[in-house]
Structures are given as C-alpha cells and as structure tokens.
C-alpha cells in the first residue's frame, strides 16, 4: 500500500481526495481502502451494492458519504463524467467497469487483463503484443474469467454503445490504440469460438504404434 499512497499524495499534493471509485474488491487491488479512509476521512466511496457488501465482510468501514451506483448510472465530477457498467462475475460478483466519458478511458477492472510483467512499458503500442503477450493474455482469460463467457458478452454489449478510446485494465498494458484487435479476441473467447480452425489430436503411446497412427492421421488431415 505504501507505493499506492505515495502515488496518490504525489498527484494530489496538499489537496484532499474527494472520491474513490471501487471497480473490484479483490485484495490485490482493494487492500488499501482502509488506509485511504484513514488518511482522507471525508472521501466519498463509489461502488455498487455488492461492492459495499464485500467491504463490510472484509472489515472496511462504509461512511455516510458512500455513493451506491447501479448499472448505467453516471456521475459528473465537474470536468469529468463517469458512467458505470456493472460486470458481475468478470470475475467477481461486484466487478464493474468505469468509463470516463470525457477522455474515453474505460477502466475495465480485470477484464482485458494480461499475465506478465511489463518491464517498464505501459501501453500496448510499446510492446509486440501478439508475440509477447497474446499467449499470457489467453491464459489469463482462461484462468480468470473463462468460465463466464455469457457475462463477458454482457459487458461487451454494454460497452459497445460508448465512445471508448482507451482501455485501462488492472493487469497488463493499457490499450490506447488497436482496441478492436483485443475486443475481437475477447468476443471469440467468450463465445467459445476458435481463433483459427484446426484439429487437436491427443494420444498416448506406450509402444509407438498409436503415435504412428496419430502422425498418419495428421498427414491425412492436411491433405
């Protein structure tokens, strides 16, 4: 939490923190809530009904300034206006995405995330994503939200009607271009459609005969 608080203080300077939007309550992201509340007791916490249920179960205080949002609600913060898209089970029940309509940045929580360190890089156009991160991204999807394809489809449909310029997930690079490439991957994965047409031949061979048969089958399939 120390690095997070240092970053917040660096950005704010002597100003107070007015709002804290909670997109996801998993402790790798939300463990610092109590410290934020202690340092900024007047902060208004924004979340959905499930967010506050989990906050209570995790032992965090819910102050009277808390703001509960529902799917599609918008809040204006002056220069910035946020719209909230609830995304239950992508991949926790309280998960939601927050769209800054002023900048077009979608803060997508765990959706569109990727395994792997970025090694000082931040944006998708700073890496060779297909070579370096597509496999970890596919593995991330499979492990984190792969079971919940219909829920991912719901989020994609909600986001489709908005002018999204950037996607900022909680893991992996921030997407500031070529968004359709990764959205198409998520669409295919969540529909359980293959990215490429092919046949997987799985076999076990104690004496090598089944292996020969499998190789012969593979050759015939390529013809």
Model-predicted segments: where are they?
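Conserved beta-strand hairpin/beta-sheet module of binuclear metal-dependent hydrolase folds
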Residues: 1-10, 97-100, 104-108, 199, ...
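Metallo-beta-lactamase
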Residues: 46-169, 175-176
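Di-metal (Zn2+ and/or Mg2+/Mn2+) metal-binding site signature of metallo-dependent hydrolases
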Residues: 4, 16-37
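Active-site neighborhood of phospho(di)ester-bond hydrolases with catalytic His/Asp-centered motifs
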Residues: 17-25, 45-48, 106-109, 167-171
